Amino acid sequence: LCDRRQRQMCIRDRQEVDGWEKAVNSLLEDSNTDIYVTGSNSKLMSSEISTYLTGRYISIPVFTLSFAEYLEFKKDSGRTPKELLNEYIRMGGFPIVALGNFDERSSYQIVEGIYNSVITSDITKRHNITNFDLFNRVVKYVVENVGKTFSANAIVKFMKGEGRSLSVEAVYNYLEWLEKAFVIYRCQRYDMQGKTVLKTQEKFYLADASLKYCMMGFNPKSVAAMLENIVYFELRRKGYDVYIGKNSTKEIDFVAVRRDERIYVQVCRNLPEESDREVANLLEIKDHYPKYVVTMDELAAGNINGVKIMHLADFLLSKEY
């Protein structure tokens, strides 16, 4: 590192080395080096790195495999993208699962192992959670309600109905810890009339669809919510900030904003013949930004008064938005 040429350095498992930040800061001062630091959340959450590298780092979010990446992993399978989409929806995007040729049961066992490791190391031990059963029930409530708006008060009332005592503050803590461990992702509501982000009735999405299935089992009735989950993360991967759209009394599944760009997205498993809700909600938005309805319906495609209807596979593989 003695000359001034641009170099790259990757530091793995930074949590294993005391004082790693001093070495990184020294390298940033004395060499023309791009440094990539990775590691477990068990000892240092990503959100805490700013205390070590104030103003001197960029956080790069890492998600499970996109559908395009999943296809690359399965390029020798001989199956079409739409055939593999069904597998992607059920199996999720963890690379270790995509690399193997596992059946559904084995895949969910692998994902459950990943989940248990994160919950144990990154959350329960770190935050000294003693009532693991209560914490786990809150997690399951969130998992059962992916893609639905709810509040901390709603969770407290639900727990009370099961004969469990839980404070609103504890719920907020649990949700925050799950977020910081990247198990769940918060999606806030955006008031499209007032142009403001609302702090109530948020939705949460899971880091990967397979997390729901490994805990709750695969249920065809839950697919619609998990399609939303998949689209949410595809928008995040493409660099969008993603919100739930609130327009008077109606809701838009996603308002995605990237600098001066914006798109609106409705997600539905099947597009009914009278597709009024999906399309009409979008047509009420009086601006020039692109509007999409994303569906699993094989026959749904085209354009309705400026609203583009796309199959989920085509949307996930598109580079035009």
Sequence positions of predicted segments:
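Single conserved hydrophobic/aromatic residue that forms the stacking wall/gate
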Residues: 1-11
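Conserved Walker B
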Residues: 13-17
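Accessory nucleic acid-recognition modules appended to NTPase machines
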Residues: 102-261
